[in-house]
Amino acid sequence: MANLTGNVYIDGLWLPGHGAPFESVQPVTGETVWDGNAASLEDVDAAVREARKAFLAWRRKSLAERQAVIEAFGELLEANKEELAHQIGLETGKPLWESRTEVAAMMGKIPISVKAYNERTGHTESDVAGGHAVLRHRPHGVVAVFGPYNFPGHLPNGHIVPALLAGNTVVFKPSELTPGVAELTVRLWEKAGLPDGVINLVQGGSDTGKCLARHSLIDGLFFTGSSTVGHLLHEQFGGQPEKILALEMGGNNPLIVQNVSDLDGAVHHALQSAFLSAGQRCTCARRLLVPKGKKGDEFLARLVEVAARITVAEFDADPQPFMGSVISAEAANQLLKAQAAMLEKGATSLLEMKQLKPDTGLLSPGIVDATGIELEDQEFFGPLLTVYRYKGFDEALELANNTRYGLSAGILSDDRKLYNRLVEEVRAGIVNWNRPLTGASSAAPFGGVGASGNHRPSAYYAADYCAWPMASLEAGKSELPDSLAPGLNFD
């Protein structure tokens, strides 16, 4: 594959952006790993207009033709998986072992998307009185895809693949923190034979994103990212019911512990839930609900003991660490400030989160006991876990639902009845039992309620927001019915 150029990609051409210069920086070494210019207003306009021009020809291709190009992209992912995994680790700081799983998820998304398209948005016919009922699905047109930095390959891919399969054209605006991953990915789409204009790449920060979101010629926007930005987009799209908006945002996710016989098994799942990807998964456990008393004390003691031994290092360290860095030194500093603010309000540190190397994104895991403390209902996107102690399961459920978010929730318990109550009473789109909260299947819907989304779940249900249904009643010719409505006379 070609070296990174720092260009935007519009109508099959790699061109310099005309906006402000910017760069992405390796979060530990400070090395510049990508530099270029943001897409200007004119660049964004050109990208949208070229996507509009390419739409009719792309949607008119058969499903098999579109699928063939997408599967060619999957083959190129396989052939270039190490290079892409390295770029993901380089820009995000996540360890290579985890970056490789991200590329594997990108490849796995393709057959799942094909299956979902056929099952949820395919073509069906049935006989009805006087003819046939036919259900078809049609693409929206030009859709904007906004990608996040935590999974810069997999998460935008989860929008792009089903959107293209359905016949849409795409303008992709990745996170300004991971532009290199986006450029490599779009180069693979180009190499796969995707026609010019079907996918376009506009790099840049909030100015570029605002230009794209407000463009009059987009038919929809698919977003994965922070609740703050998602709510701004929702406000901006108010009064535009003709445009589809799919928002997948974060959560202040609760994980309940109660009646566990395998202490280390439960501790393992709690650590995976809180600290996988350095806590930078939207489904990560942010609040750990532990019973008061001896059993809860034993669980917390073991949790802190094992968490203190978690290895943290650079993405390409050998041996590989469990955790890499967070996305930037700035993000690390914000997390440290959040920890300090909790302690100032009276919370107790069980395991102090520390910056392991000055001016880097390397943070050790942090665990804070905030029982009885009023804290802001906020998602802290990093390795910072807040513990709340409870007396009975009713209180645990009340604490679990004490959030405006509703993305994920779970319980670690041998008692199936407690899980049944959680499923019945919790408000969350993903609810797990004796599994980490960070485990989610692409063969199931992925999304939340409340401030975590707008009822447009992604993953297997992404097919739903990538196409709209057209229902038809059909007959071969017009015939006079056997019986007429009252008041009609053809004699």
Curated annotation (Swiss-Prot):
Among the Pfam families in the record, one is Aldedh
Coiled-coil residue spans: none
* UniProt-annotated catalytic positions: 248, 282
Q: Which PROSITE patterns match?
A: ALDEHYDE_DEHYDR_CYS (PS00070), ALDEHYDE_DEHYDR_GLU (PS00687)
Record's Gene3D superfamilies? Aldehyde Dehydrogenase, Chain A, domain 1, Aldehyde Dehydrogenase, Chain A, domain 2
Q: Which reaction does it catalyse?
A: N-succinyl-L-glutamate 5-semialdehyde + NAD(+) + H2O = N-succinyl-L-glutamate + NADH + 2 H(+)
Pathway listed for it?
Amino-acid degradation; L-arginine degradation via AST pathway; L-glutamate and succinate from L-arginine: step 4/5
User: What is the protein name given in its UniProt record?
Assistant: N-succinylglutamate 5-semialdehyde dehydrogenase
Which species expresses this protein natively? Marinobacter nauticus (strain ATCC 700491 / DSM 11845 / VT8) (Marinobacter aquaeolei)
The encoding gene is astD
